[in-house]
Structure formats: structure tokens, C-alpha cells
Amino acid sequence: GLFNQNNSSLARFSFGNQQMVRDYFKAVNRRGLGDTANDMAIYGSKIYVIVNISSTVEVIDFRTGSSLKQIQMLAENGSSRQPRYIAFHKKKAYVCSYDGTVARIDTTSLSIEAITSVGRNPDGICVQNEKLYISNSGGLDYSSGLGVDNTVSVVDIATFKESSKLTVGPNPGKIVAGPDETVYVATRGEDVEAGDYNFVKIDCRTNKVTQSNEKVQNFAIDGEIAYLYNYNYNTQTSSIKMFNLKTEETIRENFITDGTVIKTPYGININPYSNNVYITEARDYTTYGDLLCFNQQGQLMFRLNNIGLNPNTIAFSDKASQSDIDDNDDDKENPLAFANKVWEYRPAPGQFINTTTSAYKEGFTYDDILEEATRRIQQK
């Protein structure tokens, strides 16, 4: 959604029938999500959506799409905590908020059990080795004399108290648990648009912090492989690379191999069931963006157009939801959209049209690919 416009949405795409409901939450619950949905995750039988400006955690029944509870993230004086991101561990949810706190929520009762203080304006959270790692951005202090923060707070889960702060670099944001007891964080510099980004590794056994020369604004990790993306505000161009975390070497400078162009990458997630890479396109930040799915070879498999404003997070499940809603035709993606995509984009040899099969065969012409793709989709 757009900041202060109260127009966040949740889209649902079903791999079974290849249909999308663009505003799924509203269709089921007859109300919107709120203002600036910032993060989302599936844990157990529930979906958790962090709605930043509304200062809520929306808890949704995965099977039906119905809202179970809207948890108000408010301070004792009634002010908004402005939640940002969520992580889970042993039936507890941990939510970091811009007011410098982390809340512990019981995933059964959906009640806030405790609050602990960390650094300034936390903007990311993950779990590793029975500890929480929270990136303290200090982003709201950018224009003040105080400046941005440059630390990651380490919170012992058992005591729910901060045990240490690690200096990682100015304005840390995305933070993810990696292999071999590591945590990785992207630092964004004093001024995000200046491009002073860095990719930082934390060894959780020793708390050693290692800087790299990788320019990273956002990233996702799949085992030992990281997908790193960067956006240059001066040239308004983006780049996405594959990086081996173990060898600390670039696997492929350009992850996308088939010529697909993403103007404004806004989010990146890995499907744990297929290892496909999903990247969202925000376009100009004010019009509906898209979701693109790539295989590990960097080939576009499909694209969902106009899924919502500033799409930022994708969550996956190997189970189908069973909601009774039947959204109108305007809000559904017809399966033929995948075949029609061939008219707009000439695929490279081996281009995948959907998640299971390739429409390309040796010697196929452009028209042959379209015909074969349509035939296979109609058989589904």
C-alpha cells in the first residue's frame, strides 16, 4: 500500500488452479488490512501481517482467510509502536517496532506477553542459536543531529533481555539467519539514496562482524546461496546477483539470464518448496506492481501483473486454503495470462512458462511456443 493512504492489501495466488484473488483479505473480511502492511509470515495455521502505520498485527486463519484477531501494538500512553517485522520461535512471535521495542506474542492466545527494549527504530528481526537479532536502523533520526543507528541488538530468548549490541554499519535493515550459525544484515548508509550499501556477516558463535564490498539493499537466502539486489537511485537501474555465502564468491553477476527487466525491485523471497525466486516490481511506487517468478537458472517462469501497491513480501505454503469467497472476474487472473505473456515477451530457449513444464522444444518458433503453452495450460 501507499504510506498514509490506508490501502494495504493481501493477494492470494493458488498454484492448483492458477488463479489470483487480488484483494483477498478484503473479499473475505469486508474491510481493508490498514495502512502500510510491511511484513507477513505463515506460522502454523495462521498468517501474520504487520501493518506499520495502523500499528497492528493482523492474524488471519490460513484455511479460510478470516481475521482471527487484530493485535493493537500500542505503548502504555496509547501511542503507536509502529511494528515493522516479525519472527517466530517455539510457538512465540517476536515483533520489532519503530519505538525501540520487541514484543513477544503467544501464538495460541494471540496476546502480548512481554515487551523488551532494544536500539533505535528496529527495522528487521531474525532468530539464530536461541537468540533474537534485531537491526537498529535509527532511520527516523536521519534528519536530526542524532543521525542513524549502526547496531544489531542481541536478545537472549530465555531471558528476553538484550545481552549485547554489535556495531555493523550505518542504518541496518534486512536481517536474515544464514547457514553455519551466522546472521546476515544489509546496511544502507546515512542516506539511502546515496547507495552506500554493504552486506555484513555476523558469526553468532563469536559475535565477530565481517564487512564485505557487496552493494546490497535487500536479499534472500536459500541454503548457502544468497540473492542480492541493489538499486541505483542516480541511474534508476537495478541489479540482482547470486552469491555463495560459504566461499564468499559471486556465482553469477546477473541472476536474470533471459533478458527480463525489473525496473524497481521491491521485495525478494524464496519458495522453500521449489527453490524458485520471487521478486516484486513496484514500478513507480504509486501504481499496482507485479510479482515475477524465476527458476534458479534465472529464467522467468511466470509473472502476475497488478497484484497491489508496492508489493513487498511473499509467503508460501504447500497446503491449499479453502475459502468460500468467489471474487469477481476483474480481480482474478485468468490462467491464459501466462500464455498471453509470450505475446509481450520473447522467451529465451528453455524459458519456463509455468511452475512445472517448459513450453519450449528444440526447433520451436515463437508461435509454436505460444501454441504449446496455451495447450498445456488448458489441460490443467
What is the role of each PLM region?
Residues 1, 379-380:
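Accessible peptide chain termini
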Residues 326, 337-339, 343-344, 354-359, ...:
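Intrinsically disordered, low-complexity segments enriched in small/polar and acidic residues
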Residues 1-331, 338, 342-345:
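Predominantly soluble domains enriched in secretory-pathway, periplasmic, or organellar proteins
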